């Protein structure tokens, strides 16, 4: 059984995103345990928020983690499946509204880009879960990825 931990600051506010997240967690449940770790959202100006949230992220993590970041490496869905298939625990970090600081960027064992497009941090949560489900179906030979 795979384990995925996804760390992010702030609540998921949009109802349709919450529903999508719940949908993919349910689809993943026969194959993986998914933990969403909602961290405290920072307050203040951009710099203060980024520093607060980044400190909270680093203090919450144990071990290696993958940072979702626009400057990360792009992988195809099959490459992503190969990347996670031998890991029992995979931890992901999604930054808040302003992203993360340099310390989080450097501490990441891998930086993954979901796209060269920019997405909100809430949409990124949903997209990551969809890609995790797609990867699991590729690994298990299920008909979802064509």
Curated annotation (Swiss-Prot):
Pfam families in the cross-refs: SPOUT_MTase (PF02590)
Domain of life: Bacteria
Binding-site list for S-adenosyl-L-methionine: 68, 95, 114-119
Catalytic activity: pseudouridine(1915) in 23S rRNA + S-adenosyl-L-methionine = N(3)-methylpseudouridine(1915) in 23S rRNA + S-adenosyl-L-homocysteine + H(+)
Disulfide links within the chain: none
GO-annotated cellular components: cytoplasm
InterPro entries from the UniProt entry: Alpha/beta_knot_MTases (IPR029028), RlmH-like (IPR003742), tRNA_m1G_MTases_N (IPR029026)
Localization (cell): Cytoplasm
EC number: 2.1.1.177
CDD domains recorded: RlmH-like
Keywords: Cytoplasm, Methyltransferase, rRNA processing, S-adenosyl-L-methionine, Transferase
GO MF entries: rRNA (pseudouridine-N3-)-methyltransferase activity
Assembly description: Homodimer.
PANTHER family membership: METHYLTRANSFERASE, RIBOSOMAL RNA LARGE SUBUNIT METHYLTRANSFERASE H
Record function comment: Specifically methylates the pseudouridine at position 1915 (m3Psi1915) in 23S rRNA.
Family of the protein in this entry: Belongs to the RNA methyltransferase RlmH family.
Listed name of the protein: Ribosomal RNA large subunit methyltransferase H
Taxonomic source organism: Thermodesulfovibrio yellowstonii (strain ATCC 51303 / DSM 11347 / YP87)
Organismal lineage: Bacteria, Pseudomonadati, Nitrospirota, Thermodesulfovibrionia, Thermodesulfovibrionales
């Amino acid at each position: 059984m795979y384990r995925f931990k996804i760390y992010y600051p702030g609540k998921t506010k949009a109802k349709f995103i919450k529903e999508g997240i719940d949908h993919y967690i349910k689809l993943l449940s026969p194959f993986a345990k998914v933990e969403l770790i909602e961290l405290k959202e920072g307050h203040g100006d951009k710099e203060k928020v980024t520093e607060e949230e980044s400190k909270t992220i680093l203090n919450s993590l144990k071990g290696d983690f993958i940072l979702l970041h626009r400057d990360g490496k792009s992988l195809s869905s099959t490459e992503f499946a190969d990347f996670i298939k031998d890991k029992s625990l995979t931890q992901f970090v999604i930054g808040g509204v302003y992203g993360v600081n340099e310390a989080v960027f450097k501490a990441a064992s891998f930086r993954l880009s979901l796209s060269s497009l920019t997405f909100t941090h809430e949409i990124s949560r949903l997209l990551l879960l969809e890609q995790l489900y797609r990867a699991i179906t590729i690994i298990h030979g299920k008909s979802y990825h064509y």
